[in-house]
Amino acid sequence: MYKRQAVDHDDAILKNWMAGIKQVTGHPDPSEYDHWDNIKLTPTTNSISVRGMTNHKIIHECWRTKRPFYYVDTGYIGNNQKRKEWHRVIRNNVQHQKLVDVPANRLVSLQQSFPELKWKGWRKDGGAILLVTPSPKPCRFYNVDRDTWVEDTIATLKKYTDREIIVRDKVERRKRVGVGHIFSQIKNDNIYALVTYQSIGAIEGIIAGVPAFTGAPTAADPVSNHDLANIENPKYSDEEEIWKWQKWLAYCQYTSGELSNGNALRILQEMELE
């Protein structure tokens, strides 16, 4: 029998997601949990659900064997408060890649709650470059050494610009929301551009009006830059492109309630989000 299994039975968000699968599929026991050592012995047609990059070995093994999986993690926008309200769910990847055109309703609702999500255009008169460093989890996932990446990135930037470079490390959550959020730092430090490996900070930077440069695949890719040689001549997507991208982001993330009532899975399937 085809099975849908989850690796961590103690994760509340993952439990919500698995409950939602049951709502949609009516599978007799989609909320089956097991250890990866047991799951990996099952047919690779059996899908699994995991949450967080600490499962990097499992995800890489799924890619290798072509086992389908759903990946759950922090949402892209709207989490600028103490508690994470939004969670992204991706099939067979860790961030969404395929931009599709979707309705505006979810974005409009988010912008009503979080006015800072309204894109106000590009800030082209900034001064410094904000270098957002990768945290330990993505470093392990992508086999990147944080210090080496910082040194190499700064060295590369200095070949093409003499702008000040401000390094921002990931700190505990309560210190990076509110006044500690990237939105605030971009304004207070007069940031010109943001450079990161694959942080959601790239998304936040673009929404705040500064071009972002990324080193690994991210959901910011449709409107971000990659070649640091272009740091003084970045791509500035037009308003229509930003609007389409933001609408898509809003459809790629869900509340705990949407995870558990099945709406998250329904949206993923109906909109063919990947």
Named regions from a protein language model:
Residues 11-21, 52-57, 145-159:
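Well-ordered, non-membrane alpha-helical segments in soluble/globular domains
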Residues 10, 45-47, 75-78, 134-138, ...:
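Short, solvent-exposed loop/turn segments at secondary-structure junctions
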Residues 121-174:
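Conserved catalytic-core segment of nucleotide-activated headgroup transferases in glycan assembly
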Residues 81-126, 222-274:
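Leloir-type glycosyltransferase catalytic cores
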Residues 31-33, 158, 163-213, 217-218:
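Donor nucleotide-activated moiety binding/catalytic core segment of transferases
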Residues 38-41, 128, 192-193:
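Structural motif
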Residues 1-5:
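Conserved small/polar residues in nucleotide/adenosyl-binding loops
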